[in-house]
Amino acid sequence: MFDDVDIALHWHADDENSAAARTTLANRSAKFRFRGVSAHAAGSPDKARSALDGVEAFNYMANLMREHIPQESRIHYVITAGGLAPNVVPDYAEVFYYLRHPEAAKVSELWERLEQAALGAAQGTGTEVEWEIIHGNHPLLVNETLAKMMDEKLRAVGGVEYTTEEQAFAEELFAT
């Protein structure tokens, strides 16, 4: 695929115009979707199996893992769906996870533990879980010489200057 490629460039948002030789962490992300049985929370909670309980149990297990994984590892998550009303036990809940580490092999190893935690959470809460891998990447391999040369050329031409209108538009987007 890259037989005829001499260099590959990428861009990442930052607060300055520069070319830098910074790497990234290896990363894998997925959306974990828990399904349960909905019921009225006061009228018949015994008939329900809360998908949100599955998400919360999973998150709790992931948080407990943090003490027992390499320090340079990172686990991030956000609940993206957790129910519609407090008086209804949710039959669907979703949580979006990132797992990062400097080495891709370690991400794979830790990811297996995360998947096992999701399965355990589902078993313990009487729910079902499935997940969809959203993305994964290895850490960037940087070229210090090329980055230094590119930064020198960027500074020679002055980088990007935004108009007043572009800055106002960015501020407007930032406010939403």
Regions found by a protein language model. Name each.
Residues 1-90:
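Histidine/acidic-residue-rich, glycine-tolerant segments that coordinate divalent metal ions
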Residues 52-176:
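Metal-dependent amide/peptide-bond hydrolase catalytic core
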